[in-house]
Amino acid sequence: VIADRSTLRTGRPDPGEALWNPGVEALPTDRMRRLQWERLQRQLAYVYQSSAFYRRWFDEAGARPEDVDSWDAFTRLPILTKDDLRRAQAESLAERGDPFGGICCAPRDRVVRVNATSGTTGTPTLYLLTAHDVAVVNEMHARKYWRAGLRPGHVMLQALSLSMFTGGLPLSQGIMHLGAAVVPVGVDGGSRRVLEFARLTRPQAVVATPSFGLHLVERCPAVLGCDLRDLGIRWFFAAGEPGGSDPAIRSRLEQGFGARVFDHTGGGHAFHAITCPEHAGMHFVSADHCVLELVEPGTGRPVPVGDGAEGELVVTFLAWEGTPFVRASFGDVVRVWTGPCGCGLPGLKLSIVGRADDMLIVKGVNLFPGAVRAVLEEFVPRVTGHFRIVLARPGPRVDPPLRLRVERGSGVEGEALARLEAELVSAMRDRLRVRPAVEWVDPGTLPRPTHKARWVEVEGDG
């Protein structure tokens, strides 16, 4: 039976308990690894038996599930990419009139939800969930928010996109599963609507991208006539883009909201993580339902998961019925830590560095837009924090110098602006090994993001 609920909690814990499911979340690493291996063997057999796509995937690799008799053998299986999944989706639609027929493993009458990746770099990739899979997702959201302090009786304002975004409906359902109330305002109505509902509902918690969170801080005085920190918000949960773990961005969010800030990841699937008060990486909370690997971007060669290792994230879902991903990569580059955490909890921690397809190469230096943002944040309020990397043509290779369009802070002009530019260029050179050419624009010039921030602009696009 693939729908193994043995590590899902039944009923809610006492509000005084620190963890939603302590028997699983505090499981020693060696015991968790044994559990993963047992579930992996069942998962591989299940997808082979249930999916024409996965049978072909195994056959083309010259392997069968029973051949995967070690973790090393598992890493020799091919890596699935979004392109592979999109192609299977298109082929199934063309051949059968059914976009789900090739990769869905569960009987269709057991499917209760269709999720999709964001589709920011192409056609959205669809994946299906059964009621069991939804229960797994709900559990993982509850684990994250419970350990951050959210409890039944609290109210969370959901300010992420609700339009097929994996952090939309699934996240809202997870909040309800914990026993808290959700205000699913979303971002599609803009910042004014979000702020008005924050005033009306007085939530204790808000979830949004870091960029949109900072935009709310900026807009609140004009919209509500008060600072956002005056609304009594206690938690801000950052999601959807890198930034929530960056000390400078976290500090601005803490000050703007008057709240504790937690970075976290995980929407409608089995990969979930959240920071603890130590802010030394996000704790991987879903290891009982997801195997995490690292590989070299571009080559797919395994990267040992050791303290400080960095690589492209590869995930495999465990005890998952609908559309289980096996050795799937969606392009996220992460850094991991395996040593003890000051909070006392075992297991792996990680931070999201960026997306592999967002990486730029400037004179041989690999550069993620999030790293540029992190340096700029250190100069706030002399800069607003809003910027664009301007490219003559799509990356990853960039003809030097790297062009930055940066909003200056209010009142920063003349000699003060010249000094700021010299300091900024020096910091970029020292920290990122890149010397940019800076174009200054007035405060408020660049569009403010409502969903995931777009920091790269290709001249002539649109």
Map each language-model feature to its residues.
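Conserved AMP-binding/adenylate-forming
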Residues: 238, 243-245, 249-340
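ATP-dependent adenylate-forming carboxylate-activation enzymes
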Residues: 182-198, 368-371
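Conserved AMP-binding loop of ANL adenylate-forming enzymes
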Residues: 146-178
